[in-house]
Design a protein with these regions (language model features):
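Beta-strand-rich N-terminal accessory domains
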Residues: 1-71, 75, 196-212, 250-261
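Active-site scaffold segments
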Residues: 62-65, 133, 150-152, 226-232, ...
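Active-site/ligand-binding surface loops and adjacent short beta/alpha elements
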Residues: 141-146, 151-213
C-alpha cells in the first residue's frame, strides 16, 4: 500500500502523505500545484500543509506546567520546541477512498501524556473544497493540547487578510501575551479577531479561502518562495498563555477548509 494517498482529480484534488506526518503533500487547483513540495534534504517543517499537534508554533524553552508538574519537551528550534510531535512521524491509514481518507497516530514518546490524534481529509471536486479535521484525544489523564495546520502556499501569490488584533512578540518570535493593532508586514505573527476569512490569491487569479473554527491565525510571509496561513486553536506558547485542557471525555477537534474559486 502506498504511503501517499491521492484524492480527487488531476484538475482539483490533494495528496496526503502518511509517512511524513499525514500532511497534504500536494494541492492541485486548475491543474497546477499550489503547495511547496518535498525536496531531498528539506526540513520537515518547510513543505506541504502539515498538522501541528499537540502544540502549534513555539513552546518557550520547550517547557510547560500542568497540574503542578513541569514538563520538558525535546527542543527542535534552537532553545525552543515547535509545531508538535507528529509532523515528521508516520501515521496509520485507517480508511481511504477516491475522495476521503482518515489517518491516525499516537503523540509518541516526545509527548509526556498518552494520547492519540486523527486527521480526516475530504475532497469535494464539485464545490472545489478540501476539508481537514483534526481530533486529539487523551487516553487516561488530562493534558493541555493545541491543534493547527501549517500550509506552505507557493508564490507568486498575495494575501488578503483583515484582523482586529495581533499578539506582541519578543525577539524569539514568541507572543508575550499582550495584543496590539496589526502592523504592516512582512509577518511572522499571530492574529485574532478575523473580520473575514483569510485568502490567498495566485498569479493566475485562482483564489483559495481558508475557513476554520480555529480562532488564532499565524501569518508567515517572510520567505520569497511561499506564504503561510496557519489556523491554530490557540497562540504560540499557548500552554502558558491560554491553555486548553483535554480529557478522555472531551477531545479537541478543529476543522480547516481550503475553498478554491
Amino acid at each position: 500500500m502506498s504511503n501517499e494517498i491521492h484524492l480527487g482529480t488531476a484538475a482539483f484534488g490533494c495528496s496526503v502523505d502518511a509517512l511524513h506526518g499525514a500532511r497534504l503533500s500536494s494541492l492541485r487547483i486548475a491543474g497546477r500545484e499550489r503547495l511547496v513540495g518535498f525536496t531531498r534534504g528539506a526540513a520537515a517543517t518547510s513543505w506541504g500543509a502539515y498538522p501541528m499537534v499537540p502544540y502549534a508554533g513555539r513552546v518557550r524553552d520547550g517547557r510547560f506546567s500542568h497540574e503542578g508538574t513541569t514538563y520538558q519537551l525535546p527542543l527542535n528550534l534552537g532553545e525552543h520546541a515547535i509545531h508538535g510531535t507528529v509532523f515528521d512521524a508516520p501515521w496509520s491509514i485507517i480508511d481511504r477512498s477516491s475522495t476521503h481518507t482518515t489517518l491516525a497516530t499516537s503523540l509518541g514518546r516526545r509527548w509526556p501524556f498518552a494520547a492519540n490524534v486523527t486527521h480526516e481529509v475530504t475532497v469535494d471536486t464539485v464545490e472545489r473544497v478540501v476539508t481537514c479535521i483534526l481530533t486529539v484525544s487523551a487516553s487516561s489523564a488530562t493534558m493541555p493540547a493545541q491543534v493547527g495546520w501549517h500550509p506552505w502556499f507557493l508564490r507568486p501569490a498575495k494575501l488578503e487578510i483583515d484582523f482586529a488584533e495581533m499578539y506582541v512578540r519578543d525577539e524569539h518570535h514568541i507572543p508575550n501575551g499582550h495584543r496590539t493593532v496589526p502592523s504592516a508586514g512582512p509577518w511572522d505573527d499571530c492574529f485574532v479577531g478575523a473580520r473575514r476569512d483569510p485568502r490567498v490569491v495566485f498569479s493566475d487569479d485562482v483564489r483559495v479561502t481558508i475557513e476554520s473554527d480555529c480562532d488564532h491565525w499565524v501569518i508567515y510571509d517572510m520567505p520569497q518562495h511561499a506564504l503561510c496561513v496557519e489556523p491554530q486553536s490557540g497562540p504560540p506558547d499557548g500552554f502558558t498563555l491560554a491553555p486548553h485542557i483535554v480529557t478522555p471525555e472531551t477531545p479537541l477537534r478543529r476543522t480547516m477548509s481550503l475553498i478554491a474559486r
